[in-house]
């Protein structure tokens, strides 16, 4: 019987299934960070349980670490306590960790793939919503709660119920100026933030196959924003080429065996999906969110929608509330919206490809950050991304134009560290969530691609990067 990619990943990890469908799944890799792991480790200590499989875990501090000078440590006492607690827990249990001043430190969903800890055919969990990122490698990856983090530490298993299968198929050549971020925002705009609820989404089609691994990770990262349990892409040569030679990846004869095994993780011809959604890549244009949900998105050449035209009263109320929070009027041209801050970073868009794309726009425009922009910051996703960008001279491109070049971390994606918006500030952000207060109480977030964010920094408002040439 033909199987989908999700079917194969699920079936190869079933330990036991109850009559009601509840399944005990084996977990190959758990990624840990400082926010959702303290209670899990404390539970182990209280119960006097060991970590079942130490080598299956990898830890890093990312949410609370400063992105400015780290020589003075962490100023906020709560943030410092969380980071110190992860350090001590990993030391006590023997878990591999990249500490704050390790060059390998970075955002958990960036360091996993770049180290080769994320591999095809794996089940991967982390106490973080955007664990779906790792599905780009033909893996089943999703976020879990703190009690589940403890359960995986203790047993290397997890109780789950199988999701339905969805295929999102994107065909055709992506137009100039459009990126993986625009693809996934367009998908969410089409199906909504509840469109994937109850499903695991496989992203396929010629457009997805043409993406780099960085681009595929961006798409899978935001599967959760479409309501899906997980997002994934089939294994191909692009996957294999990315992984070869990375630190955690098998070598020699074991590499050859692994590659042969990994290549099975794709949907069989004739595999049946419960839902299929199709997009034409030629119709995708640079995207900008206007509201307080990723589904509140439109094209750069569009306008802020008018709630009066929405027939659904629930959606109309949500639109009205969003516009009030965002301080926007219906029918406002997107290109006329001015911004106060720029954030280029996050687990969605802080890889070397993203940094290069933003730097290209800055060089192309050849001007400094606009006078109305109070802060434009670039936060690499890891120490290794930062080092690579500096070798290429990209840091100087940004700093010469008036951007701040920071240390790696989650930064302004969420208001959990020193990088945040003040009430009323408007930000062009390459992150994944534009909820009320996400980047700081009263802050207003517009989600865009790195190239779009860079252009907004220079112009002081949103612009259509397709016109840059």
UniProtKB/Swiss-Prot annotation:
GO: which molecular function terms?
3-isopropylmalate dehydratase activity; 4 iron, 4 sulfur cluster binding; metal ion binding
Give the reactions, separated by semicolons, that this protein catalyses. (2R,3S)-3-isopropylmalate = (2S)-2-isopropylmalate
Per its UniProt record, what InterPro entries does this chain match?
3-IsopropMal_deHydase_lsu, Acnase/IPM_dHydase_lsu_aba_1/3, Acoase/IPM_deHydtase_lsu_aba, Aconitase_4Fe-4S_BS, Aconitase_4Fe-4S_dom, IPM_dehydratase_rel_enz, IPMI_cat
Protein name (record): 3-isopropylmalate dehydratase large subunit
Q: What pathway is this protein said to act in by its record? A: Amino-acid biosynthesis; L-leucine biosynthesis; L-leucine from 3-methyl-2-oxobutanoate: step 2/4
Q: List, alphabetically, the Gene3D superfamilies matched.
A: Aconitase, domain 3
Q: Which PROSITE patterns match?
A: ACONITASE_1 (PS00450), ACONITASE_2 (PS01244)
- Lipid biosynthesis is among the record's keywords: no
**UniProt GO BP:** L-leucine biosynthetic process
């Amino acid at each position: 019987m033909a199987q989908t990619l999700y079917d194969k990943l699920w079936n190869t990890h079933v330990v036991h299934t109850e009559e009601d469908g509840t399944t005990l799944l084996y977990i190959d890799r758990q990624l840990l960070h400082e926010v959702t792991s303290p209670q899990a480790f404390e539970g182990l200590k209280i119960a006097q349980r060991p970590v079942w499989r130490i080598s299956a875990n990898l830890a890093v501090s990312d949410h609370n670490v400063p992105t400015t000078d780290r020589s003075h440590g962490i100023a906020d006492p709560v943030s410092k306590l969380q980071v110190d607690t992860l350090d001590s827990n990993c030391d006590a249990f023997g878990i591999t960790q990249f500490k704050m001043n390790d060059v390998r430190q970075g955002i958990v969903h960036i360091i996993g793939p770049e180290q080769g800890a994320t591999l095809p055919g794996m089940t991967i969990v982390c106490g973080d919503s955007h664990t779906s990122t790792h599905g780009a490698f033909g893996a089943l990856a999703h976020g879990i709660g703190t009690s589940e983090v403890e359960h995986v530490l203790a047993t290397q298993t997890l109780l789950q119920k199988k999701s339905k299968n969805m295929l999102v198929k994107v065909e055709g050549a992506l137009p100039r100026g459009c990126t993986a971020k625009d693809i996934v925002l367009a998908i969410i705009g089409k199906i909504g933030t509840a469109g994937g609820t109850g499903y695991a989404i496989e992203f396929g089609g010629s457009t997805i196959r043409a993406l780099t691994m960085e681009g595929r990770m961006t798409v899978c990262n935001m599967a959760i924003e479409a309501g899906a349990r997980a997002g994934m892409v089939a294994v191909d040569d692009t996957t294999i080429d990315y992984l070869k030679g990375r630190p955690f990846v098998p070598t020699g004869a074991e590499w050859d065996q692994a590659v042969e095994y990994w290549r099975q993780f794709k949907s069989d011809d004739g595999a049946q999906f419960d839902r299929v959604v199709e997009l034409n890549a030629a119709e995708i244009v640079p995207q900008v969110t206007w509201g307080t949900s990723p589904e509140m998105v439109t094209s750069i050449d569009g306008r802020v929608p008018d709630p009066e035209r929405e027939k659904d009263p629930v959606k109309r109320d949500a639109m009205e509330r969003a516009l009030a929070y965002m301080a926007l009027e219906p029918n406002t041209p997107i290109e006329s919206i001015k911004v106060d801050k720029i954030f280029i970073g996050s687990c969605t868009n802080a890889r070397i490809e993203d940094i290069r794309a933003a730097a290209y726009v800055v060089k192309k425009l050849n001007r400094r950050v606009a006078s109305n922009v109070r802060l434009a910051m670039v936060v690499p996703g890891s120490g290794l991304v930062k080092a690579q960008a500096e070798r290429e001279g990209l840091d100087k491109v940004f700093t010469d134009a008036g951007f701040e070049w920071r240390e790696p971390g989650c930064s302004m994606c969420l208001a959990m560290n020193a990088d945040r918006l003040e009430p009323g500030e408007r930000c062009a952000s390459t992150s994944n969530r534009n909820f009320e207060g996400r980047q700081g109480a009263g802050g207003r977030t517009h989600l865009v691609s790195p190239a779009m964010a860079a252009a907004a920094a220079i112009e002081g408002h949103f612009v259509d990067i397709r016109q840059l040439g």
